[in-house]
Amino acid sequence: YEISACLVGSEMCIRDSTLSEPGYDMMIGDKTLINCLLEPIDASVGLLSWSTTNDRVATVDADGLVTAVGAGEAEIIAQDPLSGLSASIAVKVVGEGVVSLSLSYVRNQDELKALGWGFGQTPASVNFDAEGMTVNMSLQSNSKYRADLKMASNDRPVVLNIGTYRYLAFRMDVPGNGSLKLDTNKGDYGNNPTGVLAEDSQVIYYDLQAKPYFPTDAPSDKLTTFQLKIADVTVQPYSYKVYWVRTFKTLEDLKVYVEKENNK
């Protein structure tokens, strides 16, 4: 919308605002900063009042940072308190059939275990920081290093909806060599990922439809084995760092997500 510029005391009304949707379905635990273009250009996002129509689905803070807290749909509203005019976007949060975890929000192995995640072999050490999780792998009896990343357990099984969310992506610093094998109790996806994102070499992804393990027209069975086997490492670094793990509908959605993450 367009309205005339106005001054109230020393405060300026915003005469135009445009909010950009995330560009992908959000998942529980996701955080995204809504891109807001304002006119006049010297107007500040701090002038806006933010709200949500459903705080059980998504919350929003004073800077326009949206946090997905539950499955469903919500509308995020940015309003200029002086003029009363507003702009809004729709946000969809998916609860089942997906995988989503930012390791920057995990502080220790107890929290990781509470999420149903863990390791196939006991690592030499695991360190958490504001960016993610660094795993120092353990030496095996074959004189090679290994530490599989487990993303499911008997207590916290995984259900996949690969008909809709086809791609599983990891942002990670991989070890010096060895193999990366995505494995489930239905079968594995080979020794290497489907591809590496051209726009960001730290992002590897798997096409979950590449093997006929799961239906594409219905959710999968509950998986208690869902892991990335990281093995046979013989050159340094004997470690890997994971920033986030997530499923996506399309590679374009993945690219949009990566661009937003890189521009934080």
Model segments located where?
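Surface-exposed loop/turn motifs at beta-strand-loop junctions within extracellular Ig-like
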Residues: P40, D80-L82, D232-T234
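A short beta-strand micro-motif common to beta-rich folds, especially ectodomain repeats
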Residues: G72-G84
